[in-house]
Every structure is written in structure tokens, then in C-alpha cells.
Amino acid sequence: MTGFNWHNPYPTTRIPVFARNVVSTSHPLAAQAGLRMLWKGGNAVDAALAAAAAITVVEPVSCGLGGDAFALVWDGGTLHGLNASGVAPAAWNVDYFRRRHGEDAHGLARKPTRGWDTVTVPGVVAGWEALHAKFGSLPFADLLEPAIEIAERGYAVPPIVAHKWAAAVPELHALPGFADTFMPRGRAPEVGERVCLPGHARTLRALAQDGARAFYEGALAERIAAFARDGGGALTEADLRAYRPEWIEPIGKRYRGYTIHEIPPNGQGIAALIALGIAEHAGAAEWPVDSPESQHLQIEAMKLAFADVYRYVADPRAMEVTPAQMLDDAYLAERAKRIDPARATHFGHGRPPSGGTIYLSAADERGMMVSFIQSNYMGFGSGLVVPGAGIALQNRGHGFSMDPASPNVVAGGKRPFHTIIPAFVTEEVDGRTRAVMSFGVMGGDMQPQGHLQTVVRMLGYGQQPQAACDAPRWKVNRDFTLDVESTMARATVDALAARGHTIHSIDDPYMDFGSGQFVWRLDRDDPERGYVAASDSRRDGLAAGF
């Protein structure tokens, strides 16, 4: 069935959940919203969409109606990928940003972190619509009922959401629409305080009545575009009307007898696959679990992966190389040879052969499994909220490069480099592909790093999903310094430092090391045997099922 060691050697506040139908999210009310759909006879996609809508209400610090989404759906026989990330307004280019924001010390146009010049077309609502049209079984309006109810009646804010909410207020409180929506008492809500989001509820009711396309055409789209126009933003009704999500073929990489699947670029999921390939060639799982030798090899593999991803990944229409070239096994084997087992190294990018959220998972007793992620990017996104509508607009445009030589250079109608990545695991048995696990780890640059670390723990070391969730994590920063959770063994940290890693021990895991949700199928041939689900204690969520 699994071959897991069900012992959990790490401190935890969660237990794995065994059930025939499961939903695992970062907020209990969102998990309950998903379960309500399954109780009504809906499928895993219905459950995932209900949970996704609910979590825009109860965790607005991470996602909202103005964000983006990606999904991987196992329909019982085939894995489908959806890219619902938005594109730049048609007016954007490097000169646009240079005129409005000047140049930096390197002569490149400056790009802001918040405000209108970070707002790309929101893709999440169109993503919900696409998923429902292809796989949903309940009426779309039914899926929004729990979210509407929570937004109108209110909910008590849990500790981690309250912490992130308070941290965002000093930077965002003066931006248009933010305080009216998210500071009804003139401040961030405290733990346990009741919050209602009436504007958000009205928008959800409009989507339930008129369909998700109403977000992109008609009165609601006009309202969004007018807000942009009044604020000096470039987003127009034409930008909204032209947007469509894309069904795409997932990419995959073999690892220890399984295939790990990710969404292809413009997302960074390929970083996890590159790192897994390099780590396997380097023999990371041949050392004891949690040993400094294993951790060092995984860290170096991740650094090599990021070096390539930051150089090559962009909107696929602008990339110089293909994902297949970046994942070429011979190329990854050569990259693995660059790792010094005794020393940390700062790597440059290679030359492949020619040729950043909330995450949730749902699965049902009929065998359908969903790996879904949505995000506003940095906290509340741009900080801009459409007045009276509760639509917090993302700041995903900050992910573009201003370097004209980069494949990720900003351009109208183009998708930026994206951090959010759902994942999935399958295996081949007797010529048939079988579903194994839907999973994801939210949290900016931590996402592919979380994928690497948890997959190595489960598939390389046989740790059960909850243990893989609870284990201490490390995070490679963009300057190649290393953050580690304070729960990591001191001997391991000292041994990594002796290898030359510049290490910062972090006592606040909630903000830095991501949060995962995992659903593992117990019997690949019989979905009625059910699943085991795990939810990360670094957020307020849980796994639930029946």
C-alpha cells in the first residue's frame, strides 16, 4: 500500500487523516466548505473550488478574487494542467516603467512593489470557471454558497492570519480601498475578532448569479477598469475582456520509481524537478535522513536549480530553451558533478542542451484528485482593493524583469515569472499510469524548495506525509544564504556551517518556511480504500474527511 514508516519523529500539532473523501487546506472553514460539496454529492473539483472561494474570505492576507491560480486535476485516468495566471496590461513595456519610475543604479527601469504598476489581469476567477466547466458536477452558484455565508455572517480571525494581517497594515493602510475593506475598526483585527466582508460577499453573489465571466465583462469589469483609470493604472476593460486561462500539458521528472509533475513555465515548478534530478544524481537519499550530508546535497541541488530557473524561465513564448532541455537527464547529471560534498558553492546558470499563496488539495472516493493553488503574491498583493467589491488586486507584475535581455522582460499581454506551483505524483504499473499524491507547499521562493524536501522525505526515506510536513526545513535565499528553522538539530546546523553555508536560524516558521497540504492515495487500484491527508502546522489549517 504505502511502505511508509508511520512513526513521526518530529514535534507536531497535527495527525494524518484517513478517509475516502478528503480536503486539506490552510484554514478549517475552507476545508469545511469543500466537505459540504462532497456531502452534497459533488466531486473533488467542486470541493476544491468551494474551498478556494471560501479561503479568499477567511485568508485574505494570502489570496483573493484579484489573484492568480494554477491547478493539476487527476480525472481518474489522465492528469490535466491549468494555467490561470494573468497577463500584463497591453500598455506595459520597459519604457512605460522608465517614464513613470526612473532608473536604478544599473540603468534599468525601476519597478514598484505595490500600487497600480504591479497589477496584472487577475486570473483566479477565470480559472474557477474553467475548472468547473470541464470537471464540475454541482451548479457553480452552489460552490460559492459557503464563501458568501462566511463573508456575510463573519468569522473569527485565527492567530497566524491575524499575525500576517497586522504585519501588512503599516505598508498598505493608505492605499485606495485597503483600510475601508480590511481595517473596519481602523486597525488590523486581533485574534478571535469577528470580521465580515460585505463587499466581497456582493461580488461573490454577482458571480453566482451571472457566472464567473462577469468578472471580465460587464458592470463588474467596468468597475475594476474605472478604479484603475481613476488611480492612474494601465489595466483596461479590453485587458480584462481578452483574458483566458490555458489548459496545458504538465511537465514531469522521474524520481525513485515515481513521476513528479509540475505546471510548466511561466511558473517555477520546474525548479523542483531540476533539483530532484540533481539530488538523485548526487545521491542525497543515500545518506541518513536529516543528516548534514543529505541536507547539504539537497541545498546545493536547489541552488543549481534556481541558477537556471532565474536565468531561463519566463512566459514560454519568450523562453530561449524548453522545459525538456532544462530537465535533460544527462544535463542534470553534469550539473550534479559541480556539487562539492564538503563545501557550499555559489553557482552560475548552466547551458541546457539545444533542441511564490494558498494551496489546497481535495480527493473523492471515485478517484478524482485536485492539486490547486491561488495567490495575490505578496500578502494582500498590490494593496489596492476595488471599493465596495472586496476585490484585492494582486501585485504579480513585480515578477517581471526590467532587463531587455531577459526572457522575462516586461511586455503587454505577457505572463510574468510566477512563484505559485501545484504538484502531483503518479507511478507506472503494468503500462498504466496511476495517481499517487496531490500536494503543494505555498510560500514564494520556498515552494519548489518545499516540494524537494518533502518529496525526498516521502519517496527517498519513506516518511509518512505528516512527518514530512512537520520536519524542520531550510530555505535558500536569492543571495544563496541559508535560513533554517530553529527546530533543526544543532549538530546538523553546525555541520552545514562548517561546509561554508551562511546560516540564519529563524524562530518564526510561520512566515518563512512555507506551508504544505498533502493527499496520498492508499490503494492505487481502489479509490474507495481512500486517502491519507496531512496539513502543515505552520498555518491555521487542517485536513478533514469522511
Regions picked out by a protein language model, each given a short descriptive name:
Residues 57-74, 78-83, 234-236, 368-433, ...:
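Active-site rim segments in enzyme catalytic domains, especially the processed small/beta chain
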Residues 281-376, 389, 396, 507:
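Internal maturation/activation junctions in enzymes
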Residues 318, 414, 451, 460-510:
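Extended C-terminal subregions enriched in glycine
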Residues 261-269, 357-361, 371-384, 440-447:
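Glycine-rich phosphate/pyrophosphate-binding beta-alpha loops
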Residues 1-32, 36, 44-210, 215-217, ...:
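Noncatalytic scaffold domains of N-terminal-nucleophile
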Residues 247, 354-357, 418-420:
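Short, small/polar residue-rich loop motifs at catalytic or cofactor-binding pockets
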Residues 269-285, 425, 434-436, 443-469:
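M16/insulysin-pitrilysin zinc metalloprotease superfamily fold
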